[in-house]
Design a protein with these regions (language model features):
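Short, structured beta-strand segments at or near domain termini in extracellular proteins/domains
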Residues: 189-190
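Low-complexity, acidic Ser/Thr/Pro-rich repeat tracts that form intrinsically disordered stalk/linker regions
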Residues: 22-47, 56-58, 91, 387-424
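Feature responds to low-complexity, polar/acidic, surface-exposed segments characteristic
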Residues: 2-38, 46-98, 105-126, 132-159, ...
């Protein structure tokens, strides 16, 4: 079988292949099917996601929660583990102990009432929810499920995730049914996850390729250059350093790594760049190209030049010295914008937003409180500038009848209050 899903890099005339570049010997599985699932199962085995046992692949067997945790952690190259002390049903001696810890650390798995239920079969809606979390999928809405006979049976906690997979074309159902309450088989899950991850990139990187579908970079040090990805590019949990040079991504660039340093040179994202990890701050450097809007759902350090950033969850945005950001929109309470770089404007649509980047114009939306421009409070519906007095009427220069320059104290490096006290 030709390996269609492995990307290689041509360097100095040598072909460097990832570890999963060679097709698995399927003859070792005496129960390997010859039906609709064969291609997906073969790909899942080649990609290092699915393993058999005792000469059996057990395609029709039900996937357990522990097995799914193992597959997802392999797909994303997860290495860090969360403490499982709060879960009384996962013993350190169990084969899946490490995988369950990785899946929890990723934010893909969540338990309830002190239980992770590792040995229980996983339902289709549970599996779709885990995948939506891992791939950082959003959108679709409940209306997306109305075309399915059983779309209304989806659990409230799974609705958005299931809709996202349907909207993305990853789940189609059968005979007008999604069968959300049914347990998912190993073959069914292989079909879904191989449709969501077409290719993987290791530390050896890739050059000069066009890839159809989503690509996951799951090892640190990867360099991608001169290529087109017709889908999403996901920089996974253990990919600490990744560089892109002249790479066109028609979908999203998703940064999942907790300490990822992503360098984008003359590269583009057709939809957006999403920074989403539960475990630390990622760094993003942009030089040339067009990445559209960068959405931060976790702490982010920016260098280079970025037009627009949206802080969608409570997070800290740090703009490095020499870096520039056109505008920042904050929709999460308690978020902050700081650093020695420049930010032209911040729109604060949530409470308790703090901005300390010099000369940044900060606008507090109507009904919002606790917004700070430097050490000054910006009242609801008004605008202030870091280093100057807050103003009324939405302008950083309006609202004052004094002929004194609001910028004099900045140039003299004297605190605002002390400057005007001295004048009086």
């Amino acid at each position: 079988m030709k390996c269609k899903n492995t990307i290689a890099m041509v360097l100095a005339g040598a072909m460097l292949l990832p570890s999963n570049a060679f097709a698995a010997d399927l003859s070792q599985y005496k129960d390997f099917p010859n039906d609709w699932s064969a291609k997906s199962l073969e790909q899942a085995i080649d990609d290092g996601l699915l393993n058999g046992s005792n000469g059996m692949i057990d395609a029709k067997g039900l996937l357990t929660r522990a097995q799914m945790a193992a597959i997802v952690s392999r797909a994303f190259g997860a290495a860090k583990t969360a403490s499982l002390d709060d879960y009384r049903d996962v013993l350190p001696s169990a084969w899946y102990y490490s995988d369950m810890g990785k899946a929890v650390k990723m934010g893909a798995f969540q338990g309830a009432n002190g239980l992770l239920n590792p040995d229980a079969p996983i339902t289709r809606e549970e599996a779709f929810t885990v995948l939506a979390r891992a791939f950082a999928l959003e959108g679709g809405g409940s209306a997306t499920l109305k075309d399915f006979v059983d779309g209304g049976t989806v659990s409230s906690w799974a609705s958005e995730s299931v809709a996202a997979l349907v909207a993305g074309g990853y789940v189609n159902g059968a005979n007008g049914m999604l069968n959300l309450k049914n347990n998912i088989t190993r073959a069914e899950f292989a079909k879904v996850i191989t449709g969501m991850a077409a290719s993987y990139v290791g530390a050896e990187g890739v050059s000069g390729k066009t890839v159809e579908g989503n690509v996951i970079v799951r090892e640190s040090g990867a360099s991608l250059s001169g290529m087109t990805i017709n889908g999403d590019l996901i920089i996974a949990d253990s990919a600490d350093k990744v560089s892109l040079d002249n790479v066109k991504v028609t979908g999203r660039i998703v940064i999942r790594g907790a300490s990822t340093e992503a360098s984008l040179k003359n590269s583009s994202a057709g939809k957006s760049v999403l920074v989403s990890n539960p475990n630390g701050a990622a760094s993003l450097s942009v030089s040339g190209g067009s990445v559209g809007t960068v959405t931060a759902k976790s702490d982010l350090v920016v260098s280079g030049s970025v037009d627009n950033i949206v802080i969608a969850e409570k997070a800290a945005l740090t703009v490095q010295s020499g870096a520039s950001v056109g505008s920042v929109t904050v929709s999460a309470a308690g978020a902050s914008v700081s650093g020695a770089g420049t930010v032209s404007a911040v729109q604060a649509n949530a409470n308790n937003v703090t901005v300390s980047t010099k000369n940044t114009k900060v606008t507090a939306a109507s009904g919002v409180s606790g917004v700070k421009a430097g050490d000054k409070t910006v009242d609801s519906g008004k605008t202030g500038t870091v280093g100057t007095a807050p103003s009324s009427g939405g302008s950083s220069s309006g609202g004052s009848s004094s002929s004194r320059s609001d910028y004099s104290y900045v140039l003299m490096n004297i605190p605002y209050d002390e400057f005007y006290k001295a004048e009086l």
